[in-house]
């Protein structure tokens, strides 16, 4: 089939590479426009756009996919199908109807669970033990289309959202290629999503990434892992923001108030609503990440001081 790949962030690149290596004819890539990045805020190509440039593939970057010029180019390219991974913009009906097999989206959850922009983060934040990826027919609703297939993945105790997303990016790419092959062969079957089990996964904000020391230890651990690497878990110490690395659940341990710090010889503990957690790395503003014990010695944590 003639296909145009739609995607933007780095997590979409494994699927783009798989599509390019498949039996299908990749005629163009659709991605979000170049955006300011880095300290200089210069315009930067999306990871998907950069990959396509390196491989000599046409890149389409409409500000809005309803623009007449884009729709005209889409018709001229005449794709049979448009596979999508995290494109980042709503696709209007006028664009959805151009490919004869429509737009087929890879989403990183077991739909109808966690519809929205941050499915992996919400799976970790809510303590899911099993998650996965789904390939479904894109339609106007938010991740509501019929599902062609799924792949599952067990959540590991130390998984961050980055870890889990990396695994799903590769297993999901294999799933999407299998669905494209089945569509071409006429054997693909999409099943409507059930009405039960629907949950939403809006993008996590910087405010969401602030650690709540008044939560139980398991919830603190989930939030830290869900927000790693982005938007990045953080807290405050002496009214200054610091970023946190992984934390470790501690069996038993001393009784500490929520956020209260205890510096021991080889570890730093922080209190929660239940048992303490052991802090891993800490990065103060303008500094490199360092082991929590080194940070505590450097700032000279005193008895009773707290993270907030």
UniProtKB/Swiss-Prot annotation:
Residues bound to (6S)-5,6,7,8-tetrahydrofolate: 109-112
Keyword Protein biosynthesis: yes
Catalyses which reaction(s): L-methionyl-tRNA(fMet) + (6R)-10-formyltetrahydrofolate = N-formyl-L-methionyl-tRNA(fMet) + (6S)-5,6,7,8-tetrahydrofolate + H(+)
EC nos: 2.1.2.9
UniProt enzyme class: transferase
Domain of life (superkingdom): Bacteria
Keyword Cell inner membrane assigned: no
TM region(s), chain numbering: none
Keyword line: Protein biosynthesis, Transferase
Family assignment from sequence similarity: Belongs to the Fmt family.
Function per UniProt: Attaches a formyl group to the free amino group of methionyl-tRNA(fMet). The formyl group appears to play a dual role in the initiator identity of N-formylmethionyl-tRNA by promoting its recognition by IF2 and preventing the misappropriation of this tRNA by the elongation apparatus.
The protein's name: Methionyl-tRNA formyltransferase
Source organism of this protein record: Salinispora tropica (strain ATCC BAA-916 / DSM 44818 / JCM 13857 / NBRC 105044 / CNB-440)
Lineage: Bacteria, Bacillati, Actinomycetota, Actinomycetes, Micromonosporales
Encoding gene per record: fmt
């Amino acid at each position: 089939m003639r296909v145009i790949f739609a995607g933007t962030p780095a997590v979409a690149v494994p699927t783009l590479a798989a599509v390019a290596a498949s039996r299908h004819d990749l005629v163009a890539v659709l991605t979000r426009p170049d955006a300011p990045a880095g300290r200089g805020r210069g315009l930067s190509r999306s990871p998907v756009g950069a990959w396509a440039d390196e491989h000599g593939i046409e890149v389409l970057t409409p500000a809005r996919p309803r623009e007449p010029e884009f729709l005209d180019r889409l018709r001229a390219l005449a794709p049979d199908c448009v596979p999508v991974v995290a494109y980042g913009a709503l696709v209007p009906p006028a664009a959805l109807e151009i490919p004869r097999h429509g737009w087929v989206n890879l989403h990183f959850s077991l739909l109808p669970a966690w519809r929205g922009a941050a499915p992996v983060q919400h799976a970790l934040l809510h303590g899911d033990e099993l998650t996965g990826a789904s390939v479904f027919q894109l339609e106007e609703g938010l991740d509501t289309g019929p599902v062609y297939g799924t792949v599952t993945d067990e959540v590991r105790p130390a998984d961050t959202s980055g870890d889990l997303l990396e695994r799903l990016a590769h297993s999901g790419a294999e799933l999407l290629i299998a669905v494209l092959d089945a569509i071409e062969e006429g054997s693909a079957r999409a099943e409507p999503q059930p009405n039960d089990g629907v949950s939403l996964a809006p993008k996590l904000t910087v405010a969401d990434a602030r650690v709540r020391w008044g939560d139980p230890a398991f919830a603190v651990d989930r939030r830290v892992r869900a927000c790693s690497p982005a938007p990045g878990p953080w807290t405050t110490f002496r009214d200054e923001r610091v970023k946190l690395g992984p934390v470790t659940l501690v069996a038993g341990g001393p009784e500490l108030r929520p956020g209260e710090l205890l510096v021991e010889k080889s570890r730093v503990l922080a209190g929660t609503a239940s048992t303490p957690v052991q802090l891993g790395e800490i990065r103060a503003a303008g500094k490199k990440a360092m082991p929590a014990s080194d940070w505590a010695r450097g700032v000279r944590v005193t008895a009773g001081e707290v993270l907030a």
